[in-house]
Amino acid sequence: MRIAITGTPGVGKTTISKVLRDRLGIKVIDITEAVKKYKLYTEKDEDMDSYVIDFEKLEKFIDEIEEKEKTIILDGHVSHLLNPDYIIVLRCNPEIIKERLEKRGYKPKKVLENIQAEILDVCLCESKGKVYEIDTTNRDVENIVDEIIEAIKHKKERKGVVDWTEKYFDYLTLEIK
């Protein structure tokens, strides 16, 4: 079983995935790290300081791990595009995402692009199949993990519970060159 933990950078995917791994003993694949470490990309986008993923190579890499593991967690903002059986979409207040990404040293253009992606529900809209959406804003990690475990256990589905468009509409009209 493939469980995708997806969402805009800065929502808490890696933190949540690590706690799930520790509590459930499930193998976690950090998509970003795997892409870099095993060169599962076609090129590096210098302007956005990111990699253009070779999805065919990445899928093959995941298939090999999945043959050995009963269940795996795919941690990454593109994990929902990797044929998961179940998708957890983490959401977070755009202002908090902005702070986190700036602390990580993201370029202003990349920060804005990710804030806009969160406001526009990009990861949620791209997620197909069994999807469960969670707002992580100001929530305890253990509480979030408890909710995820319950959702997976009972195959719960929930979409459209978070909407940042009205409150943060102004971010959508900004442009950084």
UniProtKB/Swiss-Prot annotation:
It comes from the Archaea. Residues 103-113 are annotated as: LID. Residues 30-53 are annotated as: NMP. It is an enzyme of class 2 (transferase). The keyword Glycosyltransferase does not apply. Broad-specificity nucleoside monophosphate (NMP) kinase that catalyzes the reversible transfer of the terminal phosphate group between nucleoside triphosphates and monophosphates. Also has ATPase activity. Involved in the late maturation steps of the 30S ribosomal particles, specifically 16S rRNA maturation. While NMP activity is not required for ribosome maturation, ATPase activity is. Associates transiently with small ribosomal subunit protein uS11. ATP hydrolysis breaks the interaction with uS11. This is Putative adenylate kinase. It comes from Methanocaldococcus jannaschii (strain ATCC 43067 / DSM 2661 / JAL-1 / JCM 10045 / NBRC 100440). The lineage of its organism: Archaea, Methanobacteriati, Methanobacteriota, Methanomada group, Methanococci.
